[in-house]
UniProtKB/Swiss-Prot annotation:
Domain of life of the native organism: Eukaryota
Name of the gene this protein is made from: EXO5
UniProt-recorded name of the protein: Exonuclease V
Annotated positions binding [4Fe-4S] cluster: 92, 343, 346, 352
Residues that coordinate or bind Mg(2+): 182, 196
Pfam families registered for this protein in UniProt: Exo5
Cofactors: [4Fe-4S] cluster; Mg(2+)
Length: 373
């Protein structure tokens, strides 16, 4: 009963979290895949006319003119970022920028990969508990469900030692980050281990560039989770970023779900108070071990595991660097020449100014950089 699915009346971004862990939002094809996917490489991108968020055609030139002095956070009306947004920046920052500017261009091949990966994640989650659908109609309801999940998962972890799909949220350089940890469990030695599942189309481990992205992702999960259990995340910060109305009454479906879980609440504020109290009193430890498990999609065979060494200074430095783009203090950057092979499977290769300019971003694409305060 720990995880839910929202009605279409509430967008995925309204909740702050996805239904499944965000580990499968983005899957990049290997270099070998690129060599076999000429149709994908040559597929026309949004180079001439694309559909905007209001479903009206927009030309690339008009899109470029829309880039002004607003920061990406302001321009895209973002209240927070997903962990995978920063993980994608680790792969190619410019791809992240194009994805926000021109959404909806995911190639069919990649969409199929995501569907398969999500199915495997769902099957794993169902091994531990059933799913309950709770209809919601407001962003407050959606966040209430996530708070309820946290309240239910914390005692389950302490009593049974194993949970999946744990929501996390916290600040990084003044920006709210949200995500969902795939799995948490205690080892035989009593250490808290984070396990992240990654599915592979081919029966082989990923290239180092992909591993680098994955390692940063799980490190960021630990960075946020540890801050939550150490009391470094505050209700005031969450309210400031999300603009949630704590006094708004919860919907009837959410209230029923709360009562079934043993919680007598009326508003989001009631739940938020319980969540932060639970994080404080549960005596949850910080995460001791970070593990990534790679499995083959077709056969479910484990291809290998990676134990990630958490380097807090390095994580902080990367977060600071990536947030500088989102806050408008610098231009988005493409990949280095040595990693230009990534462009072979990029949906935006045909319009990429970085690629066309051999690593120099066109002034028509780059927003005016704000000076860091």
């Amino acid at each position: 009963m720990a995880e839910t699915r929202e009605e279409e009346t509430v967008s995925a971004e309204a909740s702050g979290f996805s239904d499944l862990s965000d580990s499968e939002f983005l899957e990049f094809l290997d270099l070998e895949d690129a060599q076999e996917s000429k149709a994908l490489v040559n597929m026309p991108g949004p180079s001439s006319e694309s559909l905007g968020k209001d479903d009206k055609p927009i030309s690339l030139q008009n899109w470029k003119r829309g880039l002004d002095i607003l920061s990406p956070m302001e321009r895209f009306h973002l209240k927070y970022l997903y962990v995978t947004d920063l993980a994608t920046q680790n792969w190619c920052e410019l791809q992240t920028a194009y994805g926000k500017e021109l959404p909806g261009f995911l190639a069919p091949e990649k969409a199929a990969v995501l569907d398969t990966g999500a199915s495997i994640h769902l099957a794993r989650e169902l091994e531990l508990h059933d799913l309950v659908t709770v209809p919601v109609t407001t962003k407050e309801d959606a966040w209430a469900i996530k708070f309820l999940n946290i309240l239910l998962l914390i005692p389950t972890l302490q009593s049974e030692g194993h949970i999946r799909e744990f929501p996390v949220f916290g600040e990084g350089e003044g920006v709210l980050l949200v995500g969902v940890i795939d799995e948490l469990h205690y080892t035989a030695k009593g250490e808290l281990e984070l396990a992240e599942l990654k599915t592979r189309r081919r029966p082989m481990l990923p290239l180092e560039a992909q591993k680098k992205k994955d390692c940063f992702q799980v490190s960021l999960y630990k960075y946020i989770f540890d801050a939550m259990v150490q009391g470094k995340v505050t209700p005031a910060s969450l309210i400031h970023h999300t603009k949630l109305c704590l006094e708004k009454p919860l919907g009837p479906s959410v209230l029923r779900h709360a009562q079934q879980g043993g919680f007598s609440v009326k508003s989001l504020g009631d739940l938020m108070e319980l969540v932060f109290l639970s994080l404080t009193l549960s005596d949850l430890p910080v995460i001791d071990i970070l593990k990534i498990e790679y499995i083959h999609q077709e056969t479910a065979t484990v291809l290998g595991t990676e134990i990630v060494a958490f380097k807090e200074k390095e994580v902080r430095a990367k977060v600071q660097h990536y947030m500088a783009y989102w806050m408008g203090h610098r231009e988005p950057q493409g990949v280095d020449v040595e990693e230009a092979w990534k462009c072979r499977t990029c949906t935006y290769a045909d319009i990429c100014e970085w690629r066309k300019g051999s690593g120099v971003l066109s002034s028509t694409l780059a927003p005016q950089v704000k000076k860091a305060k």
